[in-house]
Swiss-Prot record:
Substitution effect: G508V: In MCVD; loss of function
Gene Ontology CC entries for this record: basement membrane; cytosol; endoplasmic reticulum; endoplasmic reticulum lumen; Golgi apparatus; intracellular membrane-bounded organelle; nucleoplasm; sarcoplasmic reticulum
Lineage: Eukaryota, Metazoa, Chordata, Craniata, Vertebrata
Keyword Transmembrane included in the entry's annotation: no
Name of the featured protein: Prolyl 3-hydroxylase 2
Motif annotated as Prevents secretion from ER, chain positions: 705-708
Co-factor(s): Fe cation; L-ascorbate
Location of the active site: R662
Function according to Swiss-Prot or TrEMBL: Prolyl 3-hydroxylase that catalyzes the post-translational formation of 3-hydroxyproline on collagens. Contributes to proline 3-hydroxylation of collagen COL4A1 and COL1A1 in tendons, the eye sclera and in the eye lens capsule. Has high activity with the type IV collagen COL4A1, and lower activity with COL1A1. Catalyzes hydroxylation of the first Pro in Gly-Pro-Hyp sequences where Hyp is 4-hydroxyproline. Has no activity on substrates that lack 4-hydroxyproline in the third position.
Activity modulation notes: Inhibited by pyridine 2,4-dicarboxylate, an analog of 2-oxoglutarate.
SMART domains: P4Hc
Source organism per UniProt: Homo sapiens
Length: 708
């Protein structure tokens, strides 16, 4: 039965889903031959193993030579596979489905597939200088290259060879994909301090061109340089589609059939084709997520591909190219057809067109039209196959927009506000707005019983606020109970018990860990949820008080307790947490704060919500940029919250805790959705599941006390 069900759809849809690329550079001509490169390609896993062995034996010159060769071999292997696949797809295109079924109707399709397979094997063998099987590597090696582990070896080897600039490049390249690697962060700081801050530029040797161009486009857009923004966004799109082709090609390699023992796998022809092809197709479908995910992150940039067209539609409008603005706006609507702002923009752009142009003749950009058409076909086929072949698949929302559009009423500088209002034009595209923070303070506190204590002026600084009664005494006790049940020594500090001072012990826990512990019954679920709820409460207060026009996102949330170690408190002159800024590298001697990696440059606001006062010391302090002159000192107590902007205008630290345990919820926020906290997203999903379960219990009239 399965053969009769699935053979026709596969025959019909394969030509639609597997054509030669229609974008990302000129397509390969069927008669075009690949240029050959001299010399057989050495397997990158062997070079990697040789380089690592040389490093451990102290032969650093050989380590550098072999590790660099391994990286080159890895890149060249990907290029060869991509080029061979495109070359063979062009030489052996899949035929259209025959007009009527009859004997041998499927033979033209299989002839093309066999020809493509023969071409691909020949191409790979010729360009690799030997059989492709020599280049199959283990999952461990594949994972090491994905995590950029060879660059960790390289930075150490280059230091041994006194090649500081190359060491910094390698260290930074590794750190980009491993942003929580505290040792590497310290290495980069040390290298740059040795050479001088200005002497060395941080280079990511594995940077993706489409990401680099996109980031450059955003910067020019925010600077109102729309001509340059257009240039970079268009370049980003060209590079994106090239990367998409490579990603999809690499999905066509060997697949693992985890549900079957190899010797017991005796599928029929069409079942075998379907099993393999579905794995390939799901992998290709996920390239949207792959290309939107920055190195070292699990969560993709939200709405990444559509955002290019969102930026472009407004940028083209600003330079007076209304037809292109309309094309990009309509392209964006392919992904978000109900976006009211962009629908309004389409109406406005159409009103600006020359009378000789029919608005109906202006269609969405062809590149995204083709992309979305294929994406929808893939989605339909995967869902249908999942139902018919009995495998599990959940379609992700690839174009999700978190929290909706929050800055829809903002009008970028230089645009006539009255004119925009008359035409109903919605201009709200700057996702990381430049805020005049001196003028944005004093908004509503949103909740009853919260007591305003001091503002920026009273705290002798900029963008600061002190509030009381954000938590009740009962909530403080409940959070303390949660902390006692879930905190681990060194959590949040790479397992280091005393990351800032040897005289105190640090313990921590995240929101997600609290919710998981509550779900598993290790702490009361209600108490675990309180941690989640009060952090959201703090976020809303900060967003409102500082009068932000765009959504404030969580960047990191951490419950932390620091305990004074007995016998180590005599004549202490150190700090519990040294003076620092939250989004830049503080340089007290130069009175500067360098907003560059490895600092968390994306953080915009910070907050500390205190849980107790039964300890000695531990005052929170603000200082001047010299890290010595104290401008304000705050004694923690239950329910007190200090919040401030995260930049060099607010250097701060914590005085030594000399007795007892000091506990607080530390929160960092960002205005850039690209840097949202992954664990917070996962915590949101846990809360949604819990809410659904609770709703189901109410519908079934189950007593809440029966909850496990």
């Amino acid at each position: 039965m399965r053969e009769r069900i699935w053979a026709p759809p596969l025959l019909l849809l394969l030509p639609l889903l597997l054509p030669p690329p229609l974008w990302g550079g000129p397509p390969d001509s069927p008669r075009r031959e690949l240029e050959l490169e001299p010399g057989p390609l050495q397997p990158f896993d062997l070079l990697y193993a040789s380089g690592a062995a040389a490093y451990y034996s102290g032969d650093y010159e050989r380590a550098v030579r072999d590790l660099e060769a391994a990286l080159r071999s890895h890149r060249r292997l990907r290029e060869i596979r991509t080029r061979c696949a495109r070359h063979c797809a062009a030489r052996h295109p899949l035929p259209p489905p025959p007009p009527g079924e009859g004997p041998g109707a499927e033979l033209p399709l299989f002839r093309s597939l066999l020809g493509r397979a023969r071409c691909y094997r020949s191409c790979e063998t010729q360009r690799l200088g030997g059989p492709a099987s020599r280049h199959r590597v283990s999952e461990d090696v594949r994972s090491d290259f994905q995590r950029r582990v060879p660059y960790n070896y390289l930075q150490r080897a280059y230091i041994k060879l006194n090649q500081l600039e190359k060491a910094v490049e390698a260290a930074h390249t590794f750190f980009v994909a491993n942003p929580e690697h505290m040792e590497m962060q310290q290495n980069i700081e040390n290298y740059r301090a040795t050479a001088g801050v200005e002497a060395l530029q941080l280079v990511d040797r594995e940077a993706k061109p489409h990401m680099e161009s996109y980031n450059a486009g955003v910067k020019h857009y925010e600077a109102d340089d729309f001509e340059m923004a257009i240039r970079h966004f268009e370049q980003a799109l060209r590079e994106y589609f090239v990367e998409d082709t490579e990603c999809r090609t690499l999905c066509e390699g060997p697949q693992r059939f985890e549900e079957y023992e190899y010797l017991g796998y005796k599928a029929g022809l069409y079942e075998a084709i379907a099993d393999h092809y579905m794995q390939v197709l799901v992998c290709q479908h996920e390239c949207v997520r792959e290309l939107a995910t920055r190195p070292g992150r699990l969560s993709p940039i939200e709405n990444f591909l559509p955002l290019h067209y969102d930026y472009l539609q407004f940028a083209y409008y600003r330079v007076g190219e209304y037809v292109k603005a309309l094309e990009c706006a309509k392209a964006y609507l392919l992904c978000h057809p109900d976006d009211e702002d962009v629908l309004d923009n389409v109406d406005y752009y159409e009103s600006l067109l020359d009378d000789s142009i029919d608005p109906a003749s202006i269609e969405a950009r062809e590149d995204l039209t083709m992309f979305v058409k294929r994406h929808k076909l893939e989605s339909e086929l995967i869902k249908s196959a999942a139902e018919g072949l009995g495998f599990s698949y959940t379609e992700p929302n690839y174009w999700i927009r978190y929290g909706g559009r929050q800055d829809e009423n903002r009008v970028p500088s230089g645009v006539n506000v009255e004119g925009a209002e008359v035409h109903g034009f919605s201009m709200g595209k700057k996702l990381s707005p430049k805020i005049d923070r001196d003028l944005r303070e004093g908004g509503p506190l949103l909740y009853e019983n919260i007591t305003f204590v001091y503002n920026s002026e009273q705290l002798n600084g900029t963008q600061r606020v002190l509030l009381d009664n954000v938590l009740s005494e009962e909530q403080c006790r409940e959070l303390h109970s949660v902390a006692s049940g879930i905190m681990l020594v060194g959590d949040g500090y790479r397992g280091k018990t005393s990351p800032h001072t040897p005289n105190e012990k640090f313990e921590g826990a995240t929101v997600l860990k609290a919710l998981k512990s509550g779900y598993e019954g290790r702490v009361p679920l209600k108490s675990a949820r309180l941690f989640y709820d009060i952090s959201e409460k703090a976020r809303r207060i900060v967003e409102s008080y500082f009068m932000l026009n765009s959504t404030l996102y969580f960047s990191y949330t951490h419950m932390v307790c620091r305990t004074a170690l007995s016998g180590q408190q005599d004549r202490r002159n150190d700090l519990s947490h040294p003076i620092h800024a939250d989004n830049c590298l503080l340089d007290p001697e130069a009175n500067e704060c360098w907003k560059e990696p490895p600092a968390y440059t994306f953080r915009d606001y910070s907050a500390l919500l205190y849980m107790n006062d039964d300890f000695e010391g531990g005052e929170f302090i603000f200082t001047e940029m010299d890290a010595k002159t104290v401008t304000a000192s705050i004694k923690p107590k239950c329910g007190r919250m200090i919040s401030f902007s995260s930049g060099g205008e607010n250097p701060h630290g914590v005085k030594a805790v000399t007795k007892g345990k000091r506990c607080a919820v530390a929160l960092w926020f960002t205005l850039d959705p690209l840097y949202r906290e992954l664990e917070r997203i996962q915590a949101d999903e846990v809360i949604a599941i819990l809410d659904q379960e609770q709703q189901g219990k109410h519908e079934l009239n189950i007593n809440p006390k029966d909850e496990l």
